[in-house]
């Protein structure tokens, strides 16, 4: 059996710096974080953007991991180049092949901590289940979004995003750092347990399945002319029912939620999503039965069968 | 007597947009905001930066109002040019001379609402006293800071900054908009009362006098290697006593407040101040007797004697 290697990424967005702090702390005092002897590689996702104090230089790095991007290095696109580089260094067929990628993010939305999975890969769902079972975190299943693709973790056989908020861009915050550390350690501990076949998977997984994102209200010229209603602001994960308030418009009109079935909003008023025309995303909360295939996929991956 | 004219500025920093929203709302429905018949000019301070979604293009506009800047237009400095333009348009000797400037800002720090005065000008202190008497807001006296000069309101005979937080950069927030509106209306109402000589000034003014700003801890290479301690985060306006925790360093060390006299911190972890090497500012809370000269200066100004 080859040695299991795990890629840890922080600063995929250059202005989300709390995970980077944790890596620096860890470098200084290796005892601070317990990885249970599993080999890890800690990298800053987008060091150029970090230096510039920006989310990205040319394109969002976490939308740059598309198959076609890896064909050639493009000197005019810092992020496509970095995506290729990371895959060449730590991808499954790279210099230091990693089987699992964990990508640490922050949000300006009042989401607390959550795990994001991209699509329904068995090993991802198994690992997310283990974390939900340990920490009770919501799991956000991001799928069916044609406008947003090419996420970093998708380039690894198994990968999760950890998303923590609220925190302003470019700021360090003691609470966010502690929460990041807790989730990182829990992830490593759970991977270790699977490695030792000391398994305890839950029967159910609560999934917040992405349905769609909605834009802010806009005027005829395309300018935003409505803000998130006070009853919706900071109410991530709280169920929306028909006629609930969504936005206040410039003309005083209130825009309400008009769907018949309840949705759960997330990423409400996330600063980085204004440019993506996203005021919030809607999810459906679903209770899924844990599947044996998920468990087997994660075991096979970690044991590199 | 010439007509009193008041300059209202929002978006002096292009990513502080809640005041701009209020102006747009007001344009649409003029009854929404009561200015008591006083002539106002509403301007976006830095429209270029607003378009770019940034605090500024070349330099902070609210540090660009220096006498020497007004000598000539500099096409390579968008903000110096804009500062001259605003003074030419609305300055005391401008096309539409305004006697009072009110400048609406937001902060990512948990400051709530406050009034900022730059230096100890009589009319500013009188107007700030009226607002404190109505709304109980803290008044932050910014002075003795050689590194920060050239503030917009200093170019008008009387001028206050309204600062409201916490809110992420570039975001609209219903609470911030409501608070901005309340303070704007209260300011106009109080100016109106002075105009009508219907005066009620308090006997005392509580001032938070700026003492100094402190930087984040840094390593030998100048990189930030400490974050605001969890006991200090979001504790703006709360008194610091000797040995209180200020920062956590990368090496685990806690940096404490070591002065003998108590200070009151403000702008704790303000995102825009990281580039200014400011982790927070220290003030002293002082109770000042209201002075007759302040009142007279404001009356004279508003009545244009």
UniProtKB/Swiss-Prot annotation, chains A, B:
Q: What is its EC number?
A: 3.5.1.15
Pfam families noted in UniProt: AstE_AspA_cat (PF24827), AstE_AspA_hybrid (PF04952)
Which of this chain's residues are annotated to bind Zn(2+)? 13, 16, 105
**Bound cofactor: record note:** Binds 1 zinc ion per subunit.
Q: Which cofactor does it need?
A: Zn(2+)
Per UniProt, the enzyme's principal EC class comes to hydrolase
Q: Which Gene Ontology terms of cellular component type are present?
A: cytosol
Q: Does the keyword Glycoprotein apply?
A: no
- Which keywords does UniProt give here? Hydrolase, Metal-binding, Zinc
InterPro entries with a match to the protein in the record: AspA/AstE_fam, Aspartoacylase, AstE_AspA_cat, Aste_AspA_hybrid_dom
Q: Which reactions is this enzyme annotated as catalysing?
A: an N-acyl-L-aspartate + H2O = a carboxylate + L-aspartate
Q: Where are the transmembrane segments?
A: none
Quote the record's binding site residues for substrate: 55, 62-63, 163, 273
The highest taxon in the source lineage is Bacteria
What molecular functions are annotated in GO for this chain?
aspartoacylase activity; hydrolase activity, acting on ester bonds; zinc ion binding
Q: Which HAMAP family match?
A: Aspartoacylase
Tell me which family the UniProt entry assigns to this protein. Belongs to the AspA/AstE family. Aspartoacylase subfamily.
Query: What is the name of this protein?
Result: Probable aspartoacylase
């Amino acid at each position: 059996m080859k040695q299991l290697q795990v890629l840890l990424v922080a600063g995929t967005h250059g202005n989300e710096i709390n995970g980077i702090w944790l890596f620096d702390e860890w470098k200084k005092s290796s005892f601070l974080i317990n990885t249970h002897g599993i080999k890890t590689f800690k990298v800053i996702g987008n060091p150029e953007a970090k230096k510039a104090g920006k989310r990205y230089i040319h394109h969002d790095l976490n939308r740059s991991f598309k198959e076609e991007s890896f064909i050639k290095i493009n000197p005019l696109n810092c992020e496509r180049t970095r995506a290729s580089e990371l895959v060449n260094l730590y991808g499954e067929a790279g210099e230091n092949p990693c089987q699992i990628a964990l990508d640490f993010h922050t949000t300006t939305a009042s989401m607390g901590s959550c795990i994001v999975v991209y699509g329904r890969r068995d090993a991802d769902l198994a690992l997310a289940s283990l974390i939900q079972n340990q920490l009770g975190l919501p799991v956000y299943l991001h799928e069916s979004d044609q406008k947003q693709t090419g996420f970093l973790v998708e380039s690894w056989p198994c990968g999760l995003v950890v998303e923590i908020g609220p925190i302003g861009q470019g700021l360090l915050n003691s609470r966010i750092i502690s929460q990041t550390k807790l989730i990182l350690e829990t992830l490593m501990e759970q991977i270790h347990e699977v490695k030792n076949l000391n398994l305890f998977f839950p029967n159910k997984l609560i999934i917040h399945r992405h349905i769609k994102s909605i834009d802010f209200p806009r005027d005829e010229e395309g300018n935003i002319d409505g803000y998130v209603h006070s009853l919706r602001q900071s109410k991530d994960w709280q169920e929306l029912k028909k006629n609930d308030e969504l936005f206040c418009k410039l003309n005083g009109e209130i825009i309400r939620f008009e769907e018949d079935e309840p949705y759960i909003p997330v990423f409400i008023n996330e600063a980085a999503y204004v440019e993506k025309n996203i005021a919030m995303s809607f999810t459906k909360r679903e209770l899924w039965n844990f599947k044996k295939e998920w468990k087997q996929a994660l075991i096979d991956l970690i044991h590199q069968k």
